[in-house]
Amino acid sequence: PYRRQRQMCIRDSITAARLLDCDADYVAKLEADLKRFPPMQISKEGYLQEWLEDYKEVDVHHRHVSHLYGLHPGNLISPEATPELAEACRMTLNRRGDEGTGWSRAWKINFWARLGDGNRAWKLFKSLLHPAVDAATGGHGSGTFPNLFCSHPPFQIDGNYGGAAGVGEMLLQSHEGFIHLLPALPDSWTAGNFRGMRVRGGASIDLDWKDGRATRAVVTALVPGKFTVKMPASAVRAEVKVGGRTRTYKKPVFSLELNKGEEAAVYFF
């Protein structure tokens, strides 16, 4: 993943310098460096290449999928912005399979959530919670210990943190510059709510859903700014109330201008 980590670090440094209007000479150097990164490539068989050359995979089912870093936690790949690369990631995950150690399963939960497949993410989450200790033999493997520690088989905190992050990704995403509500809701999560989840850009989100459909959300600005919201797939329109004003949106993406501490109540239909 290190190549994509460096690529994103340089890209974000350029963005920060431009926002702050500083370090012009350094930005020019970084821009030249950014062009040196090889592009992400799709193999002849359709999966995302792990290496620069299209080598034949020695272990098709290996638990490591670090070449998908651009999908998660990165934001270089998404179904909307780069559909071909996203599909190549999907094929990679299907080839590698769902099995693996705790951290590997946790990461795959996040990958599938980023691809918008809540059912696959939920399936992996349930496998992450599979008892690690065999009641009959006392032996243990991957899964979760009775104290809810993730098992590699030795204790591995990656699975706990990563699994929790995966649930968050199923319910709310903001890595593409907009607030995406219920981007990967599993079919079995028919009703529920969350409160106070934070998104990039400085907002807090509350949301309720019933019968698999979002009913109401509250966007609270923690800083003044413009917040772009993408409606859940189940919604056809949204009524937004800010202060004493109400506005209706029928397009799937809309923007809200909010002051610090201001709330926008969004009702979905």
Residue ranges of model-derived segments:
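Non-catalytic C-terminal accessory modules of carbohydrate-active enzymes
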Residues: N119-K250, F254-F269
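Active-site core of glycosidic bond-cleaving carbohydrate-active enzymes
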Residues: R11-S174, F178, T215
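Single conserved hydrophobic/aromatic residue that forms the stacking wall/gate
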Residues: P1-R6, I10
